[in-house]
């Protein structure tokens, strides 16, 4: 680790102005279309970290790179193509492997910290 670089960063998640509009989900299921926004902390050739939030709704999702998630707020359910169910509440930690496919159904707006590993 380079000791000349300050790796620390602080953000108040309550401050909605810190989040940038990232648009709507790609493959919505139903009429309620989820809107996403986020805050990028760092990104390089091997990883990306940040905060992400999403409003209520359901969609088909495809995780293209391994992703670690620590959910901070909200309630949702992920169901893989193989039928594995991941119920998410505040405090849930999940890892989605590269090429994970399934659905996401958000019941209450979620916020998460994420780290994507470009593999």
Predicted features along the sequence, with ranges:
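Short, conserved beta-strand element in jelly-roll/cupin
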Residues: 54, 63-78
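A short, N-terminal "cap"/entry segment at the start of jelly-roll beta-barrel domains
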Residues: 1-46
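Conserved short histidine dyad/triad with adjacent acidic residue
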Residues: 43-63, 97-98
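Short hydrophobic/aromatic-rich beta-strand segments that constitute the beta-sheet cores
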Residues: 61, 78, 112-114
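Short acidic-glycine-tyrosine-enriched beta hairpin
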Residues: 82-98
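Ligand-binding loop in jelly-roll beta-barrel domains
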Residues: 92, 98-119
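Short histidine-centered beta-strand/loop micro-motifs
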Residues: 50-51, 59-64, 80, 86-87, ...
